[in-house]
Amino acid sequence: MVNQSLKNKKIIISAGASGIGLATAKVCLSRGAYVYLCDIDNKSLNKLNKHPLINKRLFKYNCDASDESQVLDLFKKINKKTKKIDALINNVGVAGPTGSLEKLNSKDWERTIQVDVNSHFYFTKKAIPLIKKSRNGS
């Protein structure tokens, strides 16, 4: 018997085509949720077509979470599918540069901030109006 604790809940997961994001998506799907999954890796997104847990409750989108205009486009697409969401899982992140600060490349540092900080801001800002419509989202 499937645990229905997420039955018909609508959940957005960033960076969901592999790793922790994919594992989270599988759990949500197995519990009856609709999952709106995005990832920058189109190849990994396409591999999901063959996965047994992937069904009519999964909507996949290619999106660079660190690009505000792509996040805006993503939410426009999601808004066409649903007028509310129940949860946002900000999963996107990269391992930042390591080593001596003196040798740190500014471009690598800026990319890390863009992905690990700004993307979460973009997603959360766009998700809030949809979560408010659910009246019990998180």
Model-derived regions: residue spans:
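Conserved NAD(P)H cofactor-binding loop of Rossmann-fold oxidoreductase domains
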Residues: 92-97
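Active-site loop of short-chain dehydrogenase/reductase
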Residues: 9, 84-85, 131-138
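Canonical Rossmann dinucleotide-binding motif of NAD(H)/NADP(H)-dependent dehydrogenases/reductases
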Residues: 5-36
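Substrate-binding pocket helix/loop in short-chain dehydrogenase/reductase
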Residues: 99-101, 108-110
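Conserved glycine-rich Rossmann-like NAD(P)H-binding loop of the short-chain dehydrogenase/reductase
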Residues: 31-47
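A short, exposed helix-loop element centered on a Lys and neighboring polar residues
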Residues: 124-125
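The beta1-alpha1 cofactor-binding region of Rossmann-like NAD(H)/NADP(H)-dependent oxidoreductases
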Residues: 43, 61-73, 106
